[in-house]
């Protein structure tokens, strides 16, 4: 190739190279320390479970499981509807310890730090529990029920409450560092990127809040009541709303990038999204799992289940793992959306999968926690 031709080829290829976006953050292969796996709530695991899932063990919590499991250091942590937070051996399912909150536990899912595991209950109490023996370290009382899941950012733990506040607490002592009042219940889990927490709220506002001091940096009017948690990746936010739509926002320009709203099926999106390979994947109450182009919002594929999908998908090993209220955990090919396998739990799956060390852990509406691999 002549020098001039080679230079021209380099110039033509350069924009394509620089336009490539870094891959979304993924949870480590051996851990899933919080709801959605990472503080930015990407829903991606570096682990690769087998495509054909078999039951390795089960554990009966005795009540409905809406809480999604966390996995750290070979231990599974999950909350049950009866108010118990349990720690189980990942390999065997054997009970390590049980902590009783004294209230019911709903959708709040545990977050695991170095010394403590954190969870909220429906009585509005936020708990820090010794990760090794299940003893109480401290509690913090909010003004209403907690369905939001905690996120640990250095020495601060974040959690939302139905009292309309997002709280920043000292992770070691439970002391209040700050709180931010919104105009509605804080149901969703905050997503964190570069020291800023983002909450998509029941007041139709996407708020950016500095983690160190709780200062609101800016807000964007999403125009819709939101129960799903936002996914943040490379200064973009993705989330579904109760206005039967999925939205993407450019956080630098603070404007909407695209809106996806199926014309033939008007149902809310309660599931939180996962992102990999240029696609945003989430479940809908229209009984479908949707995969959208991250740049345009155009559908890449949909997959029909037999009931609404409130469970949030996890992407691992080129596959999508997601539960449905029809009682099945589906394994789908990430590129095509074709079903690879399914596991029938026999009861609705509204909790989300946790994936680590080649295992998939999910709880069902009849109180059974499954470890599959």
Regions picked out by a protein language model, each given a short descriptive name:
Residues 1-4:
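Positively charged n-region of N-terminal signal peptides that target proteins for export
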Residues 6-16:
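Bacterial N-terminal signal peptides
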Residues 21, 27-29, 39, 57-70, ...:
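Extracytoplasmic beta-rich repeat domains
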Residues 44-62:
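A short helix->beta-strand "capping" segment at the edge of beta-propeller domains
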Residues 80-90:
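Beta-propeller domains
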Residues 89-93, 130-134, 170-174, 210-214, ...:
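Short loop/turn segments that connect beta-strands within beta-propeller blades
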């Amino acid at each position: 190739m002549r020098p001039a031709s080679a230079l021209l080829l380099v110039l033509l290829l350069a924009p394509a190279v620089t336009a490539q976006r870094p891959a979304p953050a993924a949870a480590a292969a051996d851990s899933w320390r919080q709801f959605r796996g990472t503080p930015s709530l990407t829903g991606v695991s570096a682990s690769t479970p087998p495509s054909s899932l078999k039951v390795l063990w089960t554990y009966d919590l005795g009540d409905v499981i809406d809480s999604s499991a966390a996995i750290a250091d070979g231990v599974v942590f999950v909350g049950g509807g009866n108010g118990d937070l349990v720690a189980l051996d990942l390999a065997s399912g054997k009970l390590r310890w049980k902590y009783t909150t004294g209230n019911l536990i709903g959708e709040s899912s545990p977050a695991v730090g170095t010394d403590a595991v954190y969870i909220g209950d429906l009585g509005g109490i936020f708990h820090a529990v010794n990760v090794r023996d299940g003893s109480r370290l401290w509690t913090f009382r909010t003004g209403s029920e907690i369905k939001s899941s905690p996120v640990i950012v250095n020495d601060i733990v974040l959690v939302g409450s139905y009292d309309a506040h997002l709280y920043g607490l000292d992770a070691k002592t439970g002391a209040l560092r700050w709180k931010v009042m919104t105009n509605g219940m804080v149901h969703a889990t905050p997503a964190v990127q570069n020291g800023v927490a983002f909450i998509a709220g029941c007041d139709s506002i996407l708020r950016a809040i500095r983690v160190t001091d709780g200062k609101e940096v800016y807000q964007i009017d999403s125009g819709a009541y939101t129960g799903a948690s936002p996914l943040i990746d490379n200064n973009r936010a993705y989330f579904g709303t109760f206005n039967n739509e999925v939205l993407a926002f450019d956080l630098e320009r603070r404007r909407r990038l695209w809106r996806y709203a199926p014309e033939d099926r008007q149902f809310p999106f309660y599931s939180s999204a996962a992102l990999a390979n240029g696609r945003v994947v989430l479940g809908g109450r229209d009984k479908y799992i949707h995969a959208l182009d991250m740049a345009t919002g155009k559908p890449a594929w949909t997959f029909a289940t037999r009931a609404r999908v409130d469970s949030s998908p996890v992407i691992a090993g080129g596959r999508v793992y997601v539960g449905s209220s029809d009682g099945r955990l589906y394994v789908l090919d990430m590129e095509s959306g074709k079903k690879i396998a399914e596991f029938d739990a026999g009861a609705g799956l509204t909790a989300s999968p946790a994936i680590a060390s080649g295992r998939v852990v999910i709880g069902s509406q009849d109180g059974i926690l499954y470890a599959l691999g």
